[in-house]
């Protein structure tokens, strides 16, 4: 049974081209700056995002943490969303390792932070308050199911940051998904950012790694932070080779738009089933959430286990208490897999019997 894994786009496997490139990659000691493949990857990422330099890191969490600690000192503050990955899913690392205080705002349904709230949250020059240093945005915003933040909004936040002498960091784990959905370049989306991180191992299919980009001075300082976090790697070009293919081939808008179309198709199929509630207006990129009715013939936990045991389909509960699930499409979810998932969930919910009875 071939597994259909919809838990996340982090489950993607390296493509055959990536595996071949990894096997023959030129390598060197990256701590000495001598790995030619990593140097090429960093330069490519910087060029694609319109920045001066890049730095390869082991994960998105390390990339965000390195960026935050490069921008902020101990006791200083960053403004970000309550639903931001940095705040919710990175183990409080900025506070734990850097003493950086998070000041959180509610993320709007479209993934943005309210501009007036951002302005009002910036601290006055007062000894009783931490010093505001940084604004963090996430694009796409995973906390509201992959909402892409448009260029116009990114520019407005950049203007606010500059007006107040702050820095802007963009967690762009799925930045190329945002670019594909909006019909713009990734470079345009981070033009006003002082730093950005992009993940290579989600929808882009590389096995490991992220790249952070910024000015040469920022990256020079980030090198030291990365080292202090244990992120210096030796012959990392084996990983960088896959990253180069991720950026050159898998980040293309036409490639990622397929994932978005499959997410839309899957959502529409599920929305037509009984006992499922799903807001199609929230299906904007490659992920969405659905709810299972309380009177469904199977519990949320039962649905999850039956799909795995009987159909080889893996899904992830967003909240079992709320009977909700998040589904994420990626390179290994195509039209055939979409049809199988809709059919399997329909069978478990008794869709045919429900239609006959109706």
Predicted segments with their positions:
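Conserved PLP-enzyme active-site core in the AAT-like
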Residues: 1-310, 317-333, 337, 341-358
């Amino acid at each position: 049974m071939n597994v259909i894994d919809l838990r996340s786009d982090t489950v993607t496997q390296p493509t055959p081209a990536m595996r071949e490139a990894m096997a023959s990659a030129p390598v060197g000691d990256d701590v000495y700056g001598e790995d030619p493949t990593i140097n090429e990857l960093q330069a490519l990422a910087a060029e694609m995002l319109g920045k001066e330099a890049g730095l390869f890191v082991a994960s998105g969490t390390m990339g965000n943490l390195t960026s935050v600690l490069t921008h902020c000192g101990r006791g200083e503050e960053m403004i970000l969303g309550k639903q931001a990955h940095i705040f919710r899913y990175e183990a409080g690392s900025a506070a734990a390792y850097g003493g950086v205080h998070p000041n959180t705002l509610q993320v709007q349904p479209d993934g943005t932070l309210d501009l007036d709230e951002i302005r009002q949250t910036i601290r006055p020059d007062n000894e009783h308050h931490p010093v505001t240093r940084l604004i963090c945005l996430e694009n796409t915003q995973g906390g509201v199911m992959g909402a892409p933040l448009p260029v116009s909004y990114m520019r407005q936040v950049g203007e606010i940051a500059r007006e107040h002498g702050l820095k802007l960091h963009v967690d762009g784990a799925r930045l190329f998904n945002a670019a594909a959905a909006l019909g713009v370049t990734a470079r345009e989306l981070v033009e006003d950012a002082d730093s950005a991180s992009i993940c290579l191992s989600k929808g882009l299919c590389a096995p490991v790694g992220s790249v952070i980009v910024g000015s040469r001075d920022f990256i020079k300082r980030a090198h030291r932070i990365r080292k202090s976090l244990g992120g210096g790697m030796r012959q990392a070009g084996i990983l960088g080779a896959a990253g180069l293919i991720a950026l050159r081939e898998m980040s293309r808008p036409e490639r990622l738009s397929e994932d978005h179309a499959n997410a839309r198709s899957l959502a529409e199929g599920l929305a037509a089933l009984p006992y499922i509630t799903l807001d199609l207006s929230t299906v904007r990129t490659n992920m969405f959430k659905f709810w299972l009715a309380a009177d469904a013939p199977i519990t949320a936990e039962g649905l999850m286990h039956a799909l795995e045991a009987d159909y080889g389909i893996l899904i992830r509960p967003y909240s079992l208490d709320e009977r909700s699930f998040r589904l994420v499409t990626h390179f290994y979810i195509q039209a055939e897999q979409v049809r199988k998932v809709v059919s399997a969930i329909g069978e478990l919910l008794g869709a045919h019997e429900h239609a006959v009875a109706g």
